[in-house]
C-alpha cells in the first residue's frame, strides 16, 4: 500500500489545528528576537517588536527535515511530498532537498511561486488530491497549479528587523515573480483597506483569505473581510505568525484570493 506523507514549514501559516486535521508535518522556521530564540506567543512576539526588538529568521537545517521525513517513514509512509515557499526568496526548499538526499524514503520537494498563506492553500490542495487517491507527482502538480491561480495584496509596515517604522504611510504591496512590489501608498490604514478591497474585487475572486499580524491590525483585516464577504463565495481568516511576521512586522494585513473553481 502506498502512503504519502505531506510536509511543509511554518511559513505556510498552517495552524497546529489545521495541520493535525490535514495530517501535515510542519518544520518550524527558527525565529529570534534580539539574537535569542523565541518560543512565546504570537501576541507576545509582536509586543516585543513594538518595543524595538529586532526579529530574524533562519532556514531550518537539513537535519530538521531529515528528522521529519524519517518520522513520516516510521509512521508507515512510503514517500513524502514536501511543499515550500518560493526558492527565490528563501533557502528552505534547498535545505529540504539536501535532506531528501540523506533519507531512504523517496521525497518530492516542491518550491512554489508564492509565500505565506498562499503556500498553506497549496498544501491543502495537495492534501485533498492525495486523499482522492492521487500519486505524489499528481498532488505536486495540483499544488503548483493552485499556486498559479492565486493573487495577493498586503500591507507590511516594517523597518529593518521588522521593527515599526516612524512614518505613518501605508504602502500596498503585491508578491509576484519572487519579489514584493509597491502598488500605491496611502495616508491612513482605512484608505489602504478600501483600495485593497477594490483591487481584490477587480480580480473577480471566488474565495478570499484575509490575514493579519499584530492584534492592532485585526480591525483592519475585519474591515477588509467585511468589504468582500457579500461579493465572494467565502472569506477565510488566518493569522500571520512569527515565521512570517519577523519580516512583515506587526503592522501587516492582507489577502490571497483565487477562483472558486480553482
Where are these regions (language model features)?
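Short N-terminal secondary-structure initiator segments
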Residues: 37-65, 117-139, 206
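Mixed-charge interfacial surface used for oligomerization/domain docking
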Residues: 3, 11-25, 30-32, 92-108, ...
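Glycine-rich phosphate- or other oxyanion-binding loops that anchor nucleotides, phosphorylated ligands
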Residues: 50-98, 140
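N-terminal glycine-rich anion-binding loop in soluble enzyme alpha/beta folds
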Residues: 4-64
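Local beta-strand N-terminus motif with an aromatic residue
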Residues: 3-4, 77
Amino acid at each position: 500500500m502506498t502512503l504519502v506523507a505531506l510536509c511543509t514549514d511554518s511559513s505556510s501559516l498552517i495552524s497546529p489545528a489545521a495541520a493535525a486535521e490535514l495530517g501535515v508535518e510542519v518544520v518550524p522556521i527558527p525565529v529570534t528576537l534580539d539574537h535569542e530564540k523565541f518560543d512565546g506567543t504570537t501576541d507576545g512576539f509582536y509586543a516585543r517588536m513594538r518595543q524595538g526588538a529586532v526579529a530574524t529568521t533562519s532556514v531550518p537545517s537539513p537535519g530538521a527535515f531529515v528528522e521529519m521525513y524519517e518520522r513520516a517513514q516510521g509512521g508507515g509512509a512510503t514517500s513524502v511530498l514536501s511543499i515550500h515557499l518560493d526558492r527565490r526568496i528563501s533557502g528552505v526548499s534547498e535545505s529540504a532537498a539536501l535532506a531528501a538526499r540523506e533519507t531512504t524514503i523517496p521525497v518530492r520537494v516542491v518550491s512554489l511561486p508564492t509565500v505565506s498563506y498562499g503556500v498553506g492553500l497549496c498544501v491543502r490542495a495537495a492534501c485533498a488530491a492525495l486523499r482522492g487517491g492521487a500519486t505524489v507527482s499528481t498532488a505536486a502538480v495540483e499544488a503548483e497549479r493552485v499556486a498559479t491561480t492565486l493573487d495577493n495584496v498586503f500591507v507590511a509596515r516594517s523597518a529593518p528587523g521588522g521593527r515599526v517604522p516612524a512614518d505613518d504611510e501605508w504602502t500596498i504591496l503585491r508578491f509576484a515573480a519572487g519579489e514584493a512590489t509597491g502598488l500605491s501608498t496611502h495616508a491612513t490604514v482605512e484608505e489602504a483597506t478600501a483600495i485593497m478591497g477594490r483591487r481584490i474585487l477587480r480580480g473577480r475572486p471566488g474565495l478570499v483569505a484575509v490575514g493579519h499580524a499584530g492584534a492592532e491590525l485585526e480591525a483592519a483585516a475585519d474591515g477588509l473581510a467585511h468589504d468582500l464577504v457579500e461579493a465572494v463565495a467565502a472569506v477565510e481568516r488566518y493569522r500571520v505568525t512569527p515565521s512570517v511576521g519577523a519580516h512583515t512586522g506587526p503592522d501587516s494585513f492582507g489577502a490571497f484570493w483565487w477562483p472558486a473553481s480553482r
